[in-house]
Structures are given as structure tokens and as C-alpha cells.
């Protein structure tokens, strides 16, 4: 699938946060896609015509970003092109939560990507940012399956173990590196990468599982370089971009059916 992505070089339109925009663009280029970064409301119609997919990230949310996301969804939905929503921090504020719900209820979202706290928030299950509440009986498998069913999307939950679901089947993906949690933009790039894989028009559940596995394997490969060279967070960032640009063999990442 990665080989096909690099042959096609899909154009991925990103409405993302300004903290991570450069990293997202460079990451997509490394992976083999072409980034387009725009949040100009008046050009959403035109960009939807030429782009292969849309990734929306609400990391630096404001009134203008909300209007832009709504306008973009309208046009991408009309053209039946994949849309990925990354509801960053939607468990942290009413504005983020309500905006995420409004965008989801538009009916145009193809994939919903977030961590356990974010996805749990959107299905009414309270989670801590670092995992599920000890008093909450719901498991990641139950949360992601419910999210996929409730919003008719492919749900992608990232963490130490990733999970993907279409509402019926749930797959888990292990592997990766702890360094992913120590750099800004790893999740933002992951959402954009999800959009790039969905643009290939393959089975969406399998596409998301493959993307998660490749992403974790690239992180693992980058971590090996960091350890070999006595590096840390900064060097991991650059080694990770390098790893994304190289052939990626799934040696450390494992896809398993959970449900």
C-alpha cells in the first residue's frame, strides 16, 4: 500500500494547527504524499476539486477555523472525497467538544482519529488523558467500536496500542516508540497520513490498520537510530522523518483482530 501511495502521490489538503503545520507537511512529503496547507475559507470549493483527501485538525481552534472546516466538509462531501477529523483536546473544553460533534454530525467524515480521552468524550465515556478512568468499565475496544457505530466512521484510536474499527470489527496495532509522545505534531501528522491512505480507495479498515502499523514501525526504526547515536527528542524527530521516507518493513508492529 505504501508503494502505491508513493506512485500516486495524493494531494492531501490540511486544515491543521499552526504549531504542527510544517512538521505535517514534511511528514507527508516523506511518506510519499503531497501536502496542501490552507485555511482560507473562500478557496475551499476550488481546493476540494483538486485534492484527493482532507484532514481537519482542531488543535488551535478559533472561530475562523470552525467556519473553514464546515465549508471544506461541505465541498469534499459533495465530491465524495475522504475526510479525516482529528478532534484534538475535545475532552478539554466545551468549544472543542461541541465543534467536534457538529463536524461529525455533518455526515461527511470518513475517519475519526484521536486518543482514548478524545474518543471517549465523543461517546459519553469519561477517560483520563493518560488512559481510562479506573472507575470506568469501558475498554478501548468498546470505546472505539462505539465511536465507529455512533458516527458511521472508521474510528482510529492511537496510544501505546492503536485500535481501528468499522463498528463491527476491531483491530489492534502494537509496536512503536515512546518518543512519539515526546514530540509535537506526531498525532497531527498521523491524521494527515490517515487521509492520504484513505485516498487510495482501498478497504478503509485495512487501510487504517496498515497506516498505523507503518507509522509505529517507522517510529521504532527512528528510535533505534536515536539509541545508536545517544540522541533524544530532537534527533528522533529528524530520524522519524527519515524513517517515513524509506522502505518500511513490518518487523516490530503487529496487527491483531480483537473483535
From Swiss-Prot:
Pathways involved: Cofactor biosynthesis; thiamine diphosphate biosynthesis; 4-methyl-5-(2-phosphoethyl)-thiazole from 5-(2-hydroxyethyl)-4-methylthiazole: step 1/1
Cofactor: Mg(2+)
Key words, A-Z: ATP-binding, Kinase, Magnesium, Metal-binding, Nucleotide-binding, Thiamine biosynthesis, Transferase
Enzymatic reactions: 5-(2-hydroxyethyl)-4-methylthiazole + ATP = 4-methyl-5-(2-phosphooxyethyl)-thiazole + ADP + H(+)
Pfam family, one: HK
Annotated positions binding substrate: 37, 185
Residues that bind ATP: 113, 158
GO biological process, one term: thiamine diphosphate biosynthetic process
Top-level class of the enzyme under EC nomenclature: transferase
EC number(s) stated in the UniProt entry for this protein: 2.7.1.50
The UniProt record lists the keyword Transferase: yes
GO MF, one example: ATP binding
Record-stated family: Belongs to the Thz kinase family.
Protein function: Catalyzes the phosphorylation of the hydroxyl group of 4-methyl-5-beta-hydroxyethylthiazole (THZ).
Protein name (Swiss-Prot/TrEMBL): Hydroxyethylthiazole kinase
Gene for this chain: thiM
Amino acid at each position: 500500500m505504501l508503494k502505491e501511495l508513493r506512485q500516486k502521490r495524493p494531494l492531501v489538503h490540511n486544515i491543521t494547527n499552526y504549531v504542527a503545520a510544517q512538521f505535517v507537511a514534511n511528514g507527508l512529503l516523506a511518506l510519499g504524499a503531497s501536502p496542501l496547507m490552507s485555511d482560507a475559507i473562500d478557496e475551499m470549493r476550488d481546493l476540494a476539486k483538486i485534492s484527493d483527501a482532507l484532514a481537519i485538525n482542531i488543535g488551535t481552534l478559533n472561530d475562523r477555523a470552525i467556519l473553514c472546516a464546515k465549508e471544506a466538509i461541505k465541498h469534499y462531501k459533495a465530491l465524495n472525497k475522504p475526510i479525516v477529523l482529528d478532534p484534538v483536546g475535545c475532552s478539554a473544553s466545551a468549544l472543542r467538544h461541541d465543534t467536534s460533534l457538529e463536524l461529525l454530525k455533518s455526515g461527511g467524515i470518513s475517519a475519526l482519529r484521536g486518543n482514548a480521552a478524545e474518543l471517549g468524550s465523543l461517546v459519553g465515556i469519561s477517560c483520563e488523558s493518560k488512559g481510562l478512568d479506573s472507575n470506568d468499565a469501558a475498554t478501548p475496544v468498546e470505546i472505539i467500536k462505539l465511536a465507529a457505530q455512533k458516527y458511521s466512521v472508521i474510528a482510529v484510536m492511537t496510544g501505546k496500542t492503536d485500535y481501528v474499527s468499522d463498528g463491527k470489527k476491531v483491530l489492534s496495532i502494537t509496536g512503536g516508540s515512546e518518543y512519539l509522545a515526546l514530540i509535537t505534531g506526531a498525532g497531527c501528522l498521523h491524521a494527515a497520513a490517515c487521509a492520504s491512505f484513505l485516498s487510495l480507495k482501498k478497504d478503509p479498515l485495512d487501510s487504517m490498520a496498515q497506516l498505523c502499523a507503518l507509522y509505529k514501525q517507522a517510529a521504532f526504526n527512528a528510535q533505534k537510530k536515536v539509541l545508536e547515536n545517544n540522541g533524544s527528542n530532537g534527533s528522533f524527530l529528524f530520524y522519524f522523518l527519515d524513517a517515513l521516507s524509506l522502505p518500511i518493513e513490518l518487523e516490530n508492529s503487529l496487527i491483531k483482530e480483537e473483535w
